[in-house]
Amino acid sequence: MFNNIMVPVDLAHIEVLESSLGVVADMAKHYDASITYVGVTSNAPNSVARTPDEYHQKLEAFAQKRHDVHGQPVTAKVYTSTDPVANIDDILVKSIDELDIDLVIMATHLPRHLDIVMPSHGGKVATHTDASVFLVRPQN
């Protein structure tokens, strides 16, 4: 049913992903799917990396570490943006088609009142692509 799973990764906030990583591993093993870990960074130095190449190396290391856990094929794909916060949703939507993704698994937060004004990334991605989107909330 699913062949290519995409997992958006924010290397500055890996702890937010913890609840979704087990789901990613289980789904990938169940469907014998490959996993693409996708990151979006700026061209300017930031808290994670000084350059997009350094960011890619760190995302690749993260992907390989996850491969050691679940054994499924992994790739890392980095997109650069002048404003990652403003552009992340559009970049993720475009990458789904570019990478031939059929399932996106994203960590999400508990609903907040602010979501009415500023919807979540997962909600935007789900409404702008044909791929299935699985949102994983943090466990208490």
Task: Enumerate the predicted regions with their spans.
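Small/aliphatic-rich secondary-structure junction motif
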Residues: 2-50, 73
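Solvent-exposed polar/charged
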Residues: 26-29, 68, 97, 127
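Structural beta-alpha unit
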Residues: 68-104, 111-112, 123
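Charged helix-capping and loop-helix junction motifs
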Residues: 21-22, 54-55, 89-92, 118-122
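Glycine-rich, Arg-bearing micro-motifs that act as flexible, cationic patches
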Residues: 103-129, 140
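Residue-level recognition of beta-strand->loop/alpha-helix junctions
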Residues: 39, 78-80, 137
